[in-house]
A protein has these predicted regions:
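N-terminal helix-turn-helix/winged-helix DNA-binding helices
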Residues: 41-77, 86, 96-97, 108-111
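Short, flexible, glycine-rich and Lys/Arg-enriched loop motifs at helix boundaries
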Residues: 49-57, 121-133
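N-terminal helix-turn-helix DNA-binding module of bacterial transcription factors
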Residues: 1-58, 331-333
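Bacterial carbohydrate/catabolite-sensing allosteric modules
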Residues: 43, 81-86, 113, 135-333
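Short gly/ser/thr-rich secondary-structure transition/capping motifs
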Residues: 42-47, 100, 126-128, 251
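Short histidine/acidic/glycine/proline-rich micro-motifs that form metal-
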Residues: 66-68, 96-97, 122-126, 188-192
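Central regulatory/effector-binding core of bacterial HTH transcription factors
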Residues: 81-127
Length: 333
């Protein structure tokens, strides 16, 4: 008990006596101090006293698929900073291979009486994945916001980059450079954002049969290298990728096949992750408006937490084409 009092007091910036008064439900403690102590208790993983468990903490979960892709730490920075400014403590939950699953994180967050959860890049974006844990949040009436496209039946508010506009920008750029054989490296078959990108590409390019121009991959550099290599071998000179990580894999594939980027093959990414100006060549990509989207996600969540209604719909944000050194006129132009 003494260790717990000491740790909670240090985390909350108050005395151990104040922590004791809060935990025992005594008077003489301001609401702000009481909230700080309970939040510290939640963050440190201690259970609340039984009489306090019915109240939700000012703790918000941010569940990410990974931290290796630079776009997710960038989003986390925006979301956690915005939450802190609104008086909430963020709990960052990042999945790892063989580690804690998204379902497990949901259970942990529910046990800690969180006020709400923001998901980015979770299994909600995969049509063939399990979604039971999301429905548990709905059953509990817990505020939830999703970042980027997900399956429609979940019905949570979403903030998304407009995938159709992103593809139109990338395709238009490559066409303006004279490329005619333009392919795509996308995520898995059931990945909703990739599906949207493919639909937009089919419309823009007038595809009836896309099998020769589309390859799918896990969101890894090695997976993209294999997928993009098949496109290059089929004579594709421009490749649009569903993420910057996939684009880096595509550049590696072209080089292994003796092609020069961008002289022989042009590559366009998606995200504009950190350090894309430092790649060789610097990556042409479509920038997601992460700061605006992160702020909007927090606004939607806090509005729900405060008891106001929000439209359980999707807010679409327009991306921006950023032209760098990985695209050039088609060979022979």
């Amino acid at each position: 008990m003494t260790k717990r009092l000491t740790e909670v007091a240090k985390k909350a910036g108050v005395s151990e006596a104040t922590v004791s008064r809060v935990l025992n439900g005594r008077d003489g403690v301001s609401e702000a101090t009481r909230t700080a102590v309970l939040t510290a208790l939640d963050v440190l993983g201690y259970e609340r006293p039984t009489k306090l468990r019915g109240e939700r903490a000012r703790l918000v979960g941010l569940v990410l698929p990974e931290l290796q892709n630079p776009i997710f730490p960038a989003l986390a920075e925006v979301v956690t900073g915005s939450l802190a400014q609104r008086g909430f403590t963020p709990a960052l939950c990042a999945r790892t291979i063989g580690g804690v699953s998204e379902m497990d994180y949901v259970e942990m967050l529910l046990d800690h009486q969180v006020s709400g959860v923001i998901f980015a890049g979770g299994s909600y974006a995969l049509a063939d994945a399990r979604h039971d844990h999301y429905r548990r949040l709905t059953d509990r009436g817990l505020p939830v916001v999703l970042v980027n496209a997900g399956v429609d039946e979940l019905g949570f508010p979403r903030v998304s980059t407009d995938d159709a506009v992103a593809v139109e920008q990338a395709y238009g750029h490559l066409r303006s450079l004279g490329h005619e054989r333009i392919g795509m490296v996308l995520g898995p078959e059931g990945h909703v954002p990739s599906r949207r990108k493919l639909d937009a590409m089919a419309q823009a390019a007038g595809w009836d049969d896309d099998t020769a121009y589309v390859e799918r991959s896990s969101f890894s550099m090695e997976g993209a290298r294999v997928a993009a290599g098949k496109l290059v071998e089929r004579g594709v000179t421009g490749i649009i990728c569903a993420s910057d990580v996939l684009a880096l894999g595509a550049i590696r594939a072209a080089r292994r096949l003796g092609r020069v980027v961008p002289t022989d093959v042009s590559v366009v990414g998606f995200d504009d992750s950190a350090f894309m100006t430092c790649t060789d060549p610097p990556l042409t990509t479509v920038r997601q408006p992460i700061e605006t989207m992160g702020q909007a996600a927090v606004d939607l969540l806090v509005t729900q937490i405060e008891g106001a209604g929000v439209l359980h719909d999707e807010l679409l944000f327009e991306p921006e084409l950023v032209v760098r050194g990985s695209t050039a006129p088609a060979p022979g132009r």
